[in-house]
Every structure is written in C-alpha cells, then in structure tokens.
Curated annotation (Swiss-Prot):
A GO-annotated cellular component: cytosol
Protein name: Peptide chain release factor 3
GO molecular function annotations of the record: GTP binding; GTPase activity; translation release factor activity, codon nonspecific; translation release factor activity, codon specific
UniProt cross-references to PROSITE patterns, sorted A to Z: G_TR_1, G_TR_2
Family the UniProt entry places it in: Belongs to the TRAFAC class translation factor GTPase superfamily. Classic translation factor GTPase family. PrfC subfamily.
InterPro entries xrefs: EF-G-like_DII, EFG_III/V, G_TR_CS, P-loop_NTPase, PrfC, RF3_C, RF3_dom_3_sf, RF3_GTP-bd
GO BP terms, alphabetized: regulation of translational termination
Function in brief: Increases the formation of ribosomal termination complexes and stimulates activities of RF-1 and RF-2. It binds guanine nucleotides and has strong preference for UGA stop codons. It may interact directly with the ribosome. The stimulation of RF-1 and RF-2 is significantly reduced by GTP and GDP, but not by GMP.
Protein's organism: Streptococcus pneumoniae serotype 4 (strain ATCC BAA-334 / TIGR4)
Amino acid sequence: MNIQEEIKKRRTFAIISHPDAGKTTITEQLLYFGGEIREAGTVKGKKTGTFAKSDWMDIEKQRGISVTSSVMQFDYDGKRVNILDTPGHEDFSEDTYRTLMAVDAAVMVVDSAKGIEAQTKKLFEVVKHRGIPVFTFMNKLDRDGREPLDLLQELEEILGIASYPMNWPIGMGKAFEGLYDLYNQRLELYKGDERFASLEDGDKLFGSNPFYEQVKDDIELLNEAGNEFSEEAILAGELTPVFFGSALTNFGVQTFLETFLKFAPEPHGHKKTDGEIVDPYDKDFSGFVFKIQANMDPRHRDRIAFVRIVSGEFERGMSVNLPRTGKGAKLSNVTQFMAESRENVTNAVAGDIIGVYDTGTYQVGDTLTVGKNKFEFEPLPTFTPEIFMKVSAKNVMKQKSFHKGIEQLVQEGAVQLYKNYQTGEYMLGAVGQLQFEVFKHRMEGEYNAEVVMNPMGKKTVRWIKPEDLDERMSSSRNILAKDRFDQPVFLFENDFALRWFADKYPDVELEEKM
C-alpha cells in the first residue's frame, strides 16, 4: 500500500445543521450512493419502523433527533469518505464541538423554507473559528421555500461568509422543475426519465415556464454582481459553494457529492501544545481521542474511543504511547464504522477515524504517539455547564450498576460530574436539559440503574487551584465540589455570589472553561 496515495484519497467531514433541516436524510442518501445501504431510510420512519442508519441509539430512534455523533465510512469515485454525523440538538454542543475538531471540512444543511437558524449559526461559528471549508446544501426544494437570492444574502449577512451558487433552482415546491447547474453547465431535471439536459435545451423544455425566465434573470444578475468562484477562497473557509436540492426525494444529492469530493481538502495537520503542526505525511503514527461512546453494542457493555489519525499509518497490534499517563497501550482490537455496525480493521491512515476498544485507559482529548514521540496535541475544548442536578441511585442494591453507568457516561463527555466536598453527593452539570433526559434514559436502559434526579437550577461555575483551596471559603452562597479529575470547583448561586467571593478573596484565581 502506498501510504501517501492512500492519505490523498481521504475526505473527512462533518454535517452540521439546525434540528429538522434534513441532516440525517442527506447522510442517508450519501451512504446510499456509497453503496453502504440498499435504500435510504428517513427519520420519518418512526411509524414504519425503518430507522435512519446514522441514528442508532434507542433514544434517537424514539425522538428522531441525533444526540450522539456517529461515524460512517464509504468509498466513492476513488475517494475514501469519512462522514461524522453531529448532534443537531443544541444541548449537545460539547460533543459536537469536539467532533468538529476531528474533520477537515463541514457540510452545512439549511432548510430552504427557514433559512439560517440558531443552531446552524452556533455550529458555523465553531467551523469558522477553525478556518475549515464549508459547503452549503440548501435542502427541501420539493417544498415551498424562500427566494434563492434571499438565502444567499442570509449566508452573507447572518454568517458573514461569501457564497457562490453551484446550481440554481427552477421553481420550488409543487412547481419545482429541476436545477440550472452553473458549475457543470447543464440542466438537472426533476421530472421525466432523463436526468440531465444541455443548457441549450432549456428554452425548449421550459420556454413557457415563468420560473425559468426568473432563473435566467437571477443568473444574469449573479454573473454581474455575484462573487467570483475561487477554489483558494473555498479552502480558506472564506467562500461557501452553495448547492440546492432535496434530500428527501434524493434530488441534487449525487451532483453535490461528486462536486464536493472534487473540492474538499485532503487531511490537514494538527497543532501540538508547543504550536508546531504535525504533518499528515509524517511516517510516524499519531492521533487523538475526540469522543468516547459507551454501549455501541449493549449486549457487550463495551466502550469505544474514537481516534482521528493525524499522521502516518495505523497497523493492527501496534504499541502506542499515551503521554497523559506516561504509559503505553497496544492497539489490537480496532474497528471502523458504519453507524452501529463495525468491522475489524488492520490498517488505516491519516484522515481516517478508528474505534479503539477501551477498558478505561483513554480519556477524551488523549494524544496517541509511537516510538520516542511523547508530544501532545492542543487540548480539546470543554464547556462550562450551566444547569445542575443532584443524582443518586433509586435502589441502594443497584449501587454497582449506578457507579459503572455514571463513570462510563461521564467519560463520554455528555454530562459533567461533580462531587460535593462536604457531603460526597453526586451532582451532574450540563449545557441543556435534554442531556439530563438522555443520561436518565441511558442509565435505566443500558445499565439497569434507575436514578433519582433533583434540580439544583442554574449555577455559575469556577475552578480554583488546589493550593488556593481553604474549606472555610464554602458558604451558603456557593457549593464546594470536586470535578471528575479531583480538581476543586465552586458552584456559585449567581453572579452576585461570584463577585462577593472574588472581592473577599482577591488573591484566589477563578478559572472559567470555554
């Protein structure tokens, strides 16, 4: 195997969107073209019992939303495609944020009837901060939506990114006739037996259609006043190519996939803590754990650490360093994914995502290296939780299951765990309410441990250095606790309590996470 050639083939990207914009449906269609599934199931399959391939966890199937990031891989057109499907629900920003650290590009799915929505904006900010390319898919053209020019304007005004339309819709909703493909210089037809026609046939096909006249006017306007196409600007994350289509009816998706693969970047390097960048073509293997997922196979109560390979080649059975602990590990039981199904892998290269069977060795953010290399990659972001719950086992006899469940789910990073310094009570912190619901559901469903959860409301959280800690600092306005790494942390009732504490102890440094 020529490793350099293999690395060049890799295209690793995440799909981001607001809930219900059609992210899971487009993922399905891409897998369909990759030959991974025989028919694209859609999330609407709640009534029929056919669930989307990427929404594999029980609670996702019930709700029709993605709450974990799943990884899928397929080959298409000489490229090895790795898709990371991110949670579309706003409460799962931490997991999503980390996933976006492991990709080289992002596909942003927008509901053409709703335009840019809150969660899309939030996720886009993360992608923009990383400076990776964004490809936009304006979805649901089979329904009535906003004017295409207005949608492009929203990209520029709300997200602050220039856009270039790769194709243009001819009509919408019931009047939808197809796409005027500017990049490939052809028409893509929504109805009839023929899929494509030449631009010269446009007047013959749509001559009397008022929408087609509008399309020609719009394109003339774009040619005169629109942005210029620039591959350089796309790769720099300064220009987003825009594709129109309908994931549900599988229209425009294959054209999108083929064009995307032409312009999406090869695997990029990753920054170490000393600021140096590790090149994907370095011969030495390196990677980082961006996610840990328990119970991908509930029958075996397993846990998988998801690793983005940054450089070199993984070979089954290889020994790696874990600089965080100073110890080593052997990578013998390693898999690659198709949502819930997986297969053992013997080789993988930079750009690939592998799953390492984990018995408690790894943490999110861990760096893996080989040989004398003991460096670490820059730390992954963590979020400061905003709402808290006290949590305990409903049945004292189930304490063992309770502790195992908490330990595993907390290591995934979906909730954060704190322990009251004085009472030893467990407290959970989260960004949003849904995280608690998912935690409770999974504790009961996967660990057979019913839990009692009591709301503590919102808190303002600050970490302090262990050497600054004095237990007398604890008062009725705060709770002194330890996080899961045994670091001291204060949970303040409100901002007033925080300011009061800061005034009383001016020499104590209070640290806030992201």
